[in-house]
């Protein structure tokens, strides 16, 4: 009996010793996962949102829980090429969707993700790209089955075509939003151009009036100088007789 008890105690000790490395390994794996860097797309996006020099185009919202693209046209034209080597705003929006961002409101381009916060850059490591849903594949050549196949042999619902239509609808919606934003931007530029033209016309008119006033005073001064010269030529007279 004592041998059996000692054997059980030995087994307990062994289990305790084995348990410690296991917990340690779990802890290490968690730490390693936490140290994984965020995707480059998120790093670049966070950087441009954080940059105070671009606040007129893109910046955090008032609470720091999301960011707003204030000027989509300028953002696509000036900033996107320096960040992602393209100028397609719709593509940028689709990328945000794949990382779980959502459009907060319909009145402006505001996007939010609970792991994308002002002053909490480390949270981005928890954001991962959504895995696209796999379509059915041909067993012989592993090519994608045409999307006209609506239902599989077991009667399950279609799995690929819905996702494809959602992507197309999202792309079309983003394109329409971009088109509307560009129209609004163009309208604002036209209004500003008309205002500047009006101000320029007023400035030219004032400048012309000023030049006319200067010319008039210059002419009066020349006339006064000529009269003074004539009086000096007449000399001094006494009872109408010129004194020598």
UniProtKB/Swiss-Prot annotation:
Region (Disordered): 216-244
Keyword annotations from UniProtKB, A to Z: Cytoplasm, DNA-binding, Nucleus, Phosphoprotein, Stress response, Transcription, Transcription regulation
Acidic residues bias locations: 220-234
Description of post-translational modifications: Exhibits temperature-dependent phosphorylation.
Region described as Hydrophobic repeat HR-A/B: spans on this chain: 173-218
DNA-binding region, residue intervals: 38-132
UniProt cross-references to InterPro entries, sorted A to Z: HSF_DNA-bd, WH-like_DNA-bd_sf, WH_DNA-bd_sf
UniProt-annotated location(s): Cytoplasm; Nucleus
Comment on protein domains: The hydrophobic-rich region (HR-A/B) corresponds to the oligomerization domain.
Subunit structure: Homotrimer.
Protein name: Heat stress transcription factor B-3
């Amino acid at each position: 009996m004592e041998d059996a008890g000692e054997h059980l105690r030995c087994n307990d000790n062994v289990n305790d010793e084995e348990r410690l490395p296991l917990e340690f390994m779990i802890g290490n794996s968690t730490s390693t996962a936490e140290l994984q860097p965020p995707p480059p797309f998120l790093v670049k996006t966070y950087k441009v949102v954080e940059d105070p020099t671009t606040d007129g185009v893109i910046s955090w919202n008032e609470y720091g829980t999301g960011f707003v693209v204030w000027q989509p046209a300028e953002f696509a034209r000036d900033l996107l090429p320096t960040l992602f080597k393209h100028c397609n705003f719709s593509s940028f929006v689709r990328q945000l969707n794949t990382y779980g961002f959502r459009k907060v409101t319909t009145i402006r381009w505001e996007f939010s993700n609970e792991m994308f916060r002002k002053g909490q850059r480390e949270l981005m490591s928890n954001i991962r790209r959504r895995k696209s849903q796999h379509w059915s594949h041909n067993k012989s050549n592993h090519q994608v089955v045409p999307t006209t196949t609506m239902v599989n042999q077991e009667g399950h619902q279609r799995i690929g075509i819905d996702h494809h239509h959602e992507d197309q609808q999202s792309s079309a919606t983003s394109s329409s939003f971009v088109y509307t934003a560009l129209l609004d931007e163009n309208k604002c530029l036209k209004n500003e151009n008309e205002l500047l033209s009006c101000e320029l016309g007023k400035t030219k008119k004032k400048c012309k009036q000023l030049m006319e006033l200067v010319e008039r005073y210059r002419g009066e001064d020349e006339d006064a100088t000529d009269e003074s010269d004539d009086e000096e030529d007449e000399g001094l007279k006494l009872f109408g007789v010129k004194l020598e």
